């Protein structure tokens, strides 16, 4: 259990859930642009994991692709709901906050995930078998570390699932994503990773956060209970497409935009073997010189 700075009195809801409770509703909030090649695998995966609902905020260009073209069956059975935020930029954090405020009263847990993030739970447990364990009874948030996967020496997209194409974990990362308890007052989400609580305009992390594996990524190999398989780069070709979609947090004319591209390229080659072919693909696509 990781302790923060708040006292329980700041939280209106003092949770003490039983694993045998009758209600068990878990949803995911996601936002995406140009993700039709990947979104169906994501939806099918979490359907099988036991998620009850996925809210997808459609951030495609006004005349761009539509999630409905690949998810209509899941939309019709009410597992997926598409919310139109097309044509807007750098809105991931506002959308996460909006989604929590709108839906937190209806769900016990809300997860905030991208379409390249797949929650793995050992022993093939469903998320409900896992998240309603008594060890989480008084927990307001569960943080799952990323394990980053490399490109398996592939350079271009193939019409196969991410889980099939990329099977080599390469880095235990200190970052990750969270599932947050519903019905929390004053919750704010300042980043895509860890929400917190706003008390008199001061931001605090949660009092009780559980990390199934070590926060600094040191126990993954010994204790792989639950973590997120994060296919951050995929291939060089797909990584270019990812960068060209724009940044989740600031506009293209922001002073930090160019440096963010450089940092992302550096991360790409820290995860993947640097080859002339990959460098050429990135330089041509991103119109930048790579040393």
Predicted ranges, named:
Residues 1-44:
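N-proximal low-complexity "stem/linker" segments adjacent to membrane-targeting elements
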Residues 1-11, 93-94, 121-291:
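Catalytic-site signature of metal-activated, phosphate-bearing donor transferases
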Residues 53-58, 81-82:
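Short hydrophobic alpha-helical runs that function as membrane-insertion/retention elements
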Residues 59-62, 118:
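Conserved short acidic donor-positioning loop in nucleotide-sugar-dependent glycosyltransferases
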Residues 106-114, 127, 139:
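Divalent cation-coordinating acidic motifs and surrounding scaffolds
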